[in-house]
Structures are given as structure tokens and as C-alpha cells.
Amino acid sequence: MPVLEVLHPLVRHKVGLLRAADISTKKFREITAEIARLLAYEATADFPLEQVTVECWSGPTAVDQIKGKKVTIVPILRAGLGMMDGVLDMIPNAKISVVGLSRNHDTLQPEHYFENLVGSLEERTALIIDPMLATAGSMIATVDLLKRKGCRDIRALVLVAAPEGVKALSAAHPEVRCWTAAIDSHLNEVGYIIPGLGDAGDKIFGTKG
């Protein structure tokens, strides 16, 4: 299944902390970054390794290093930025690509307004990051864009997904794997995930209340 729910106890505990209605902006940011690190750990488990020799304190020693993987992290503005530092902690040499999409609150469809992508996407693994996979419209649009630019290895990391979004992403891009910290119950009538986290962008940036 292309959408993989990470059921590790630490992940489940931290998602529970995020759901608290009275969580502070500071705490929401911190836990979002922590979960992003854990999702990045899961999403890179199949990266190939090669042995190299390094000079250890005891002499030359063979060690494992990731082999030839060029990675670009692709936050979907604006909420995806809240996950970026957590992923960078795990992959500090990754390049950053940015995609700006906003959701039309009448149609629930994504509207593209910005992009700044690194070069040589055909040689890179792209990790799209966005806290919420609701209708999956923004995620599908971002995958479409990366494919048009030549990227062939595309993965996604989200905090919370709705079954509707899981189904839509799987139908549109069955080869794209997505790691999520939780698959929730459903979308409400205005396209919010239930129980969800509320507006993750507002909680990360401290806007609206």
C-alpha cells in the first residue's frame, strides 16, 4: 500500500500530544519537527549503502555510508515548512525545493502560486513534506509537478492523513509511497480531517488566535 502508517509507540504518543486543543505554538512546532525526524527515518530505510574506509582512532576501518543518494526536501507552503528542520536534521546535505499551493475553500482544490525547484531532479529522491493529507489535492499537484520536471523517485511525509486522501493519492500515483504518523477517521463537510489537528499551518505559525 503506498500510504504507510507508522505505528511506532513514540510516533503515536507524539501525535496524541499534537491533538490537544490548548497546545502552544512552541510545543506544536517542536513536536512536529520530532515526528518529521521519525518519518524521515522510516522513509529512507531502503537507501543503498556502500563501504568506505575511514581513519579511525585504532587505524583504517570499513564503515557504511549512503551510496550516491541526492535528496531534495519539498515543503508545500506554508505548513510544510514546519516539518523541514526535522527532516534536515536527518539528511543535512539535502537540497530544498519549494512549492506554493493554497486550497480554494469553496472548491477544496489546490491553486498553484509559487515554485522554486533545484536542478537535476531526475537524479534526486524527492521527499514532499506537508502536515495534512486531507483531499490529497495539494500532494497530487506537487507530485504531478515533480514528474513533469523529470523526478522519478518521489516520496511523501505527512503527520495525519484522511482515508479520502489516502485513496485519492493511491489512485493518482500508485507508485508514490507516503509515510504518515496517523490515518484518521474522515473529512468533514469543509474538508478538514477528523479528529485531525486543526489548521496545522496556523498552529505552526501562530496565526489566528
UniProtKB/Swiss-Prot annotation:
It comes from Methylibium petroleiphilum (strain ATCC BAA-1232 / LMG 22953 / PM1). PANTHER family: ADENINE PHOSPHORIBOSYLTRANSFERASE (PTHR32315), URACIL PHOSPHORIBOSYLTRANSFERASE, CHLOROPLASTIC (PTHR32315:SF4). The gene is upp. Pathway: Pyrimidine metabolism; UMP biosynthesis via salvage pathway; UMP from uracil: step 1/1. Its cofactor is Mg(2+). Its EC number is 2.4.2.9. This is Uracil phosphoribosyltransferase. Allosterically activated by GTP. Uracil binds at residues 193, 198-200. Binds 1 Mg(2+) ion per subunit. The magnesium is bound as Mg-PRPP. One of its GO terms (biological process) is UMP salvage. It holds the Pfam family UPRTase. The lineage of its organism: Bacteria, Pseudomonadati, Pseudomonadota, Betaproteobacteria, Burkholderiales. It is an enzyme of class 2 (transferase). Catalyzes the conversion of uracil and 5-phospho-alpha-D-ribose 1-diphosphate (PRPP) to UMP and diphosphate. One of its GO terms (molecular function) is uracil phosphoribosyltransferase activity. 5-phospho-alpha-D-ribose 1-diphosphate binds at residues 78, 103, 130-138, 199. Keywords: Allosteric enzyme, Glycosyltransferase, GTP-binding, Magnesium, Nucleotide-binding, Transferase. It catalyses: UMP + diphosphate = 5-phospho-alpha-D-ribose 1-diphosphate + uracil. CDD domains: PRTases_typeI. Belongs to the UPRTase family.
